[in-house]
Amino acid sequence: MTAFADLHHADAPLLLPNAWDHASALALAARGFPAVGTTSLGVAASAGLPDGAAATRDDTLRLALALGSQPFLLSVDAEGGFSDDPDEVAEFARQLWVAGAVGINLEDGLGPPGRHAAKIAAVKSAAPGLFVNARTDTYWLGGGDGDGDGYGDETETLRRLELYQQAGADGVFVPGLTEPRSIDALVKHLTTPLNVLYSPAGPAVPHLADLGVRRISLGSLLYRRALGAAVETMTAVAAGRTPQGTTPSYEEVQALSRPVLSHRAHG
């Protein structure tokens, strides 16, 4: 078992912050988080591209290359692998592994579960040490906690997750799942660690831990809050008010580039 996989079996769930660039990743790691993920929305929006449209393959790989040698465990949000061809997804995953990533997040987008399972199997064959977090979008795109059409309910969710487990997934991810009873039911049926997306309106971290959740991702929340803080700061200044909140100093932000400069100097 890898160090990253071990974090999914510790006493407390893995709380995974999601970064969108070098500075955000290094700042989070500096606060003691042993692993940092990326957010596909943050990466896409920063590049002026849409999320979930397979448009950010190069941007995602570029960020992985910048972060893979840093002193934290890196997991990459790769949307659906940027292709419907399992071999192409596997090759991209192999490149992430070579770059230094230890995990990959692959979402099914409510597409054919057999196709997604084939992607997972191909990735595990190409990069056996890469932790594959298989995401199903039954709750994210399927209408929330049950909408009567087979999506957003436990039966369809479990059907997909069991198929992904059989294909070799190391963990499974159900964003949008917040109802404690449904979380508890899934945990009892799964053989791999369950990952959920943190929601300010959902259960708190201690409650999720009690339910058996093993990984809690922040997704795009940090990126969206950073955008909100920037706008609020400018609005306050324009209104003659002193901006509130914590602001890193110029020197603190500048210091975040030193690991990269040091790596390049000795590379």
Located regions from the model:
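Active-site mouth loops of central-metabolism enzymes
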Residues: 7-24, 49-57, 74-88, 131-156, ...
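Conserved anion-binding
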Residues: 98-167, 239-258
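Alpha-helix-loop-beta-strand connector modules within alpha/beta enzyme cores
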Residues: 50-76, 99, 112-135, 178-203
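N-terminal amphipathic alpha-helix/helix-capping segment at the start of soluble metabolic enzymes
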Residues: 1-18, 22-30, 121, 125, ...
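Glycine-rich, proline-tolerant flexible connector loops at the mouths of alpha/beta enzymes
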Residues: 35-61, 80-84, 104-118, 123, ...
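Catalytic beta/alpha-barrel core
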Residues: 16, 20, 102-110, 153-154, ...
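Catalytic cores of alpha/beta
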Residues: 24-30, 82-95, 200-213
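Extended, intrinsically disordered, low-complexity segments
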Residues: 221-267
